[in-house]
């Protein structure tokens, strides 16, 4: 049996930046671009990996209607293709399991939408294994380790080929990985792409950069054929985020559709050549947000106490991780150290 082409899309966060109209228009344009990728690559199945919406406790009326209309138009223009939407943490009103019914898909689309369109599926309150062997796990079913174990046990003996979820795969411990029985896992949730090839774990990242945590980094839509990622399509449509340091700014001229931070040492920032270069960049890029940040030689923590940069930074980091996050930090650190060996 020939493997289906599957287009996989990470977090979108419609309604971000306090429901900014400007951002909404950018995201609408990219949504249209994604439909062209679906058609051009003969994708029979389309999977959104969660966090289609941003503000979990309220959906802006304009945002909700725009997204509903875009999804409706997309699935109606492609009636023989299967469209699948996983619920992410931002799509739920509350992090309590008993409240999982209160989610963005139920409010914006409702069960009537699925009855009207038989080629769209929203996975919000229970896992689902489809006829292709794709297992869909909404956010709640990976965040609770006990619930995760029960879910995998429930599908034991079934033919699972791929798993799609909304989780930080970097924090999965060896027990969770063993439960996968070697099946690849593709996930949203973490905005920066991350891969563990050995265990077949793929955090595919967000569909678009959303803030300066995504600085100097590209985002993609992925084409899968079977379990293999056969192509990545770079997002060149929406805003990008860039950060440059000191002498790097002298290689810059024009920016396009982005936000820029220029980090300059305090002892350099008032030198004539830096002042003139910053003026030139702002003059030549009137529509671009360019922020200049003066850097100190020391790092500053929340209490505005200077850190001795000659001390062991690893020990400093270890001692400043919050207790409730330390186990996750240890898991991530061990994986990084293992990969660096």
Model regions and ranges:
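Active-site neighborhood of phospho(di)ester-bond hydrolases with catalytic His/Asp-centered motifs
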Residues: 8-10, 45-51, 82-89, 121-126, ...
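Short, conserved loop/helix-junction motifs that constitute active-site signature segments
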Residues: 74-79, 155-157, 176-181, 253-255
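Metal-dependent catalytic neighborhoods of phosphoester/phosphodiester hydrolases
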Residues: 18-20, 50-71, 87, 92-114, ...
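Conserved beta-sheet core of the metallophosphoesterase superfamily
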Residues: 168-232
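Active-site regions of enzymes building and remodeling cell-envelope glycoconjugates
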Residues: 119-121, 132-134, 160-161, 177-185, ...
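N-terminal active-site segment of His-dependent metallophosphoesterases
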Residues: 1-65, 148-160, 335, 341
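Accessory, non-catalytic peripheral segments of nucleic-acid enzymes
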Residues: 225-341
């Amino acid at each position: 049996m020939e493997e289906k082409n599957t287009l996989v899309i990470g977090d979108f966060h419609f309604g971000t930046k306090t429901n900014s109209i400007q951002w909404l228009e950018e995201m609408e344009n990219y949504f249209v671009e994604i439909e062209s990728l679906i058609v051009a690559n003969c994708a029979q199945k389309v999977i959104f990996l969660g966090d289609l919406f941003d503000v979990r406790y309220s959906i802006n009326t304009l945002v909700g209607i725009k997204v509903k209309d875009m999804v409706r138009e997309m699935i109606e223009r492609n009636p023989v293709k299967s469209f699948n939407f996983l619920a992410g943490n931002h799509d739920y009103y509350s992090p309590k399991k008993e409240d999982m019914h209160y989610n963005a898909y139920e409010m914006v689309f409702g069960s009537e939408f699925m009855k009207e369109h038989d080629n769209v599926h929203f996975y919000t309150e229970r896992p689902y294994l489809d006829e292709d062997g794709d297992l869909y796990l909404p956010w709640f079913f990976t965040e609770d380790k006990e619930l995760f174990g029960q879910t995998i046990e429930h599908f034991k003996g079934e033919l699972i080929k791929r798993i799609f979820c909304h989780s930080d795969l970097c924090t999965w411990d060896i027990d969770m990985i063993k439960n996968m029985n070697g099946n690849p896992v593709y996930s949203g949730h973490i905005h920066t792409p991350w891969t563990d090839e050995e265990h077949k774990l793929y955090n595919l990242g967000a569909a678009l950069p959303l803030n300066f945590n995504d600085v100097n980094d590209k985002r993609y839509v992925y084409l899968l054929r079977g379990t293999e990622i056969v192509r990545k399509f770079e997002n060149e449509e929406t805003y990008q985020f860039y950060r440059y340091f000191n002498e790097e700014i002298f290689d810059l001229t024009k920016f396009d559709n982005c936000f820029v931070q220029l980090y300059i040492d305090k002892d350099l920032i008032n030198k004539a050549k830096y002042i003139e270069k910053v003026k030139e960049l702002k003059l030549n890029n009137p529509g671009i947000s360019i922020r200049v940040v003066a850097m100190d030689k020391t790092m500053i923590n929340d209490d505005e106490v200077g850190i001795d940069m000659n001390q062991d930074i690893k020990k400093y980091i270890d001692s400043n991780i919050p207790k409730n996050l330390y186990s996750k930090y240890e898991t991530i650190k061990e994986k990084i150290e293992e990969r660096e060996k």
